[in-house]
Amino acid sequence: GIAFDAAHGASTAVTRGDDGAFVRGVALGLFATDPSWDYGPLVDEIRSRGATDVLVVVNAYQSARFASDIALRPGRSPSHRTVARTLAQVHEAGMRAALMPVVRLERRGPRDWRGRISPADGLDAWFTAYRRFVLPLARLAEQQGAERFVVGSELSSLEPYHARWRALISELRDAYSGLLTYSANWDRVDAVEFWDALDEVGLTAYFPLAEGHDRPSREVIARAWRSPRMQIDALARRVGKPVLVTEVGYVSQRGAAGMPWEHSATNALDLHLQQRLYQGFCDAFAQTPSVSGFYVWNWFGVGGPRDHGFTPRGKPAANELAKCFARAWAAPAPVGNNR
């Protein structure tokens, strides 16, 4: 495909599997209640900001933390046809496409989330159900020529069963020929023991920044990124693979710096803090060769100046991201053998 540079009206070729090109990406959750919803206009909005990549996100659901009944749910999950069409629209818009399957919980207690899944009927049942969810999506990604596939997202409690993950990754390699990664939670990434089976280290970068500051300045945010950036550099060196930031995102609310993962907060609207947090992330990583790129979480949503959520649509953050994407980013350094 052709990557469109909105800042200069120029275009640069990007080809499938070209992991030497820095990923300046945006996640697009297929979260509409209509399973056949057309995400084409949102894809075009992302392209108009100068992004080179889109991470298409597909939610499946299991009934609760102790369950194993993973399935695409009508009214909450897209159809396979919609996923295929969206991947095609990303390529038609001149961007690279990645696909990330995510498991969510239908019923959850206050501390329940997918990182604490503990299947009551055993690991065999859960991994069988998970395999039924992700393998068809990997085949679909292969058919559509998607450049990347994320084998899992933030399944922290299940990561220690690395032999099962290795078996699944091997099966995914048979079905899919592009780049494979896994998306680990920022505080669990060092504990994952199957990075050697993947092409990139993936992490969600919801590091707590500037705790105790409701409205931190650009300078405070820049200082807060120093330690996480050193951790990421050390991780890339230890594993011998580049680090892909599979999610980085902020709600447009006060307090977003201290707990960036908190999606249900109801604090005062703060559009400019969201903008500064993206500015700070881009300041921190523009010249970091251990990082192969990032995806902003997440374009889907109403957006606009009264929206408290993650989406940058129609907010100052969207203009900040356009500037961020147009920067000169360091090419990922070869830190080791990919396979």
Describe these PLM feature segments:
Residues 2-46:
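Boundary/entry segment of secreted carbohydrate-active catalytic domains
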Residues 4, 9-17, 260-263, 273-280, ...:
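Aromatic-rich peripheral "rim/lid" segments of glycoside hydrolase catalytic domains that contact
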Residues 24-28, 52-56, 97-101, 149-151, ...:
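Hydrophobic faces of well-ordered beta-strands that scaffold small-molecule active sites
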Residues 27-33, 67-80, 119-131, 152-159, ...:
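The substrate-binding groove and active-site-proximal loops of carbohydrate-active enzymes
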Residues 33-47, 127-140, 185-194, 275-284:
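Short, acidic/polar
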Residues 49-68, 82-158, 253-256, 297-302:
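Substrate-binding cleft and catalytic face of glycoside hydrolase catalytic domains
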Residues 79-80, 85-86, 93, 100, ...:
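Glycoside hydrolase catalytic-domain groove-lining segments
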Residues 133, 148, 158-183:
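Active-site neighborhood of glycoside hydrolase catalytic domains
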